[in-house]
């Protein structure tokens, strides 16, 4: 298993975000920039950020959060999927009890 990456106040969010990459650099190719399980503790967030040259999708594994997509905010839960296209912005905040866990996939446009 690859070493987790811990980011503080990621993209201007609050608290810490832990990424657990699932693919090594050798396993990734020109079609995948990142594939990771992400954990955001209760009350923490991943700040709103814009994607340039790539797109990102989240599949929520556990928890409840507020997902912001181009200025509109939605509540998402385990089993939901989000998508942020190239040129658009998104972010999320863990508003539930316990950790928010999701799979994140970034692909080039």
Residue ranges and their predicted role:
Residues 71-86:
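Short acidic-glycine-tyrosine-enriched beta hairpin
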Residues 48, 67-68, 84, 90-97:
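Short beta-strand His + acidic residue motifs that chelate non-heme Fe in jelly-roll/DSBH
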Residues 42-44, 53, 72, 88, ...:
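A generic "binding-loop/recognition-motif" signal
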Residues 21-24, 36-51, 86:
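Conserved short histidine dyad/triad with adjacent acidic residue
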Residues 38, 83, 97-109:
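A short hydrophobic beta-strand segment most commonly corresponding to one strand
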Residues 62, 70, 107:
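Cofactor-binding loop segments of dinucleotide-utilizing enzymes, especially the Rossmann-like FAD-
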Residues 37-41, 50-67:
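Short, conserved beta-strand element in jelly-roll/cupin
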Residues 1-33, 47:
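A short, N-terminal "cap"/entry segment at the start of jelly-roll beta-barrel domains
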